[in-house]
């Protein structure tokens, strides 16, 4: 079910309801329920990127092979990101970092280190503004292209993979992705590492959610993530999984 099909179904239901009201006097409250259901579905379709409601996003890979991809959002975040990079290097794991463009300024060497150590860089917008999903498609595209320019100036590469801020999608995000030639990336395992404060609970949540072809969402801005990462990597391997870089798992070129 996507936005277009849902709207067609909704129009059909409204017409049926109008017909029923004329013949059977369904009453005004019924229209209120219809509106509530419509708004609820639109909200969930925007919030849950895996629904593919407004925009087709890659959230996992269909496979029977036991491998997953690690992804980190919102960085780079100075010391926290450096600690995560050290742990990944020690464990010979390559990951995807969906960076915020404004965070790259002043941390150019850290971004270069990510590339040099075999990690992939993705576009997570330049501003990561809390009202990003309310931007016009033109403003969204300017924001994404700004991030891409900054990244290219520092590293020589311009990211194709884009993860929407907060994972929120809508028609304008879809227009932006199509016009900019981006590939929308979601996730199949949301760690909630920015919310969960108990390390054991965080580990249990992630490890119990593992499935072949999963994309795991983490944040290199979160201190608890760096603290649990060594045990997380061990736990993933103990369960027979390999960790490979996102673009390699998808077999797609991550840069223009």
Explain the meaning of each model-derived region.
Residues 83-84, 109-113, 172-176, 228-232:
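A short acidic, amphipathic alpha-helical/loop segment
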Residues 72-74, 99-101, 123-125, 164-166, ...:
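A cross-domain feature marking catalytic cores of carbohydrate-active enzymes
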Residues 133-138, 196-198:
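Short, solvent-exposed loop/turn segments at secondary-structure boundaries
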Residues 1-70, 82, 86-96, 208-256:
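Terminal accessory/targeting
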């Amino acid at each position: 079910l996507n936005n277009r099909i849902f709207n067609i179904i909704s129009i059909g239901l409204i017409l049926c309801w109008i017909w029923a009201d004329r013949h059977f006097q369904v009453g005004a409250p019924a229209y209120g329920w219809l509106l509530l259901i419509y708004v609820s579905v639109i909200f969930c379709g925007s919030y849950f990127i895996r629904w593919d409601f407004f925009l087709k996003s890659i959230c996992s890979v269909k496979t029977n092979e036991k491998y997953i991809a690690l992804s980190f959002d919102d960085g780079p975040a100075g010391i926290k990101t450096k600690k995560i990079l050290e742990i990944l290097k020690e464990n010979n794991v390559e990951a995807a970092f969906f960076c915020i463009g404004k965070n790259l300024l002043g941390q150019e060497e850290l971004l270069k280190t990510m590339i040099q150590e075999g990690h992939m860089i993705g576009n997570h917008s330049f501003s990561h503004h809390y009202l990003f999903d309310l931007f016009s498609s033109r403003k969204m595209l300017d924001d994404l292209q700004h991030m891409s320019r900054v990244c290219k100036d520092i590293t020589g590469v311009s990211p194709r993979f884009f993860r929407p801020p907060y994972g929120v999608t809508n028609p304008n995000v879809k227009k932006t992705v199509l016009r900019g030639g981006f590939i929308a990336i979601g996730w199949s395992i949301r760690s909630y590492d920015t919310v969960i404060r108990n390390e054991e609970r965080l580990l249990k949540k992630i490890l119990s959610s593992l499935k072949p072809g999963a994309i795991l969402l983490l944040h290199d801005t979160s201190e608890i993530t760096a603290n649990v990462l060594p045990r997380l990597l061990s736990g993933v391997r103990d369960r027979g999984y390999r960790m490979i870089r996102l673009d390699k798992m998808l077999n797609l070129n991550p840069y223009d």
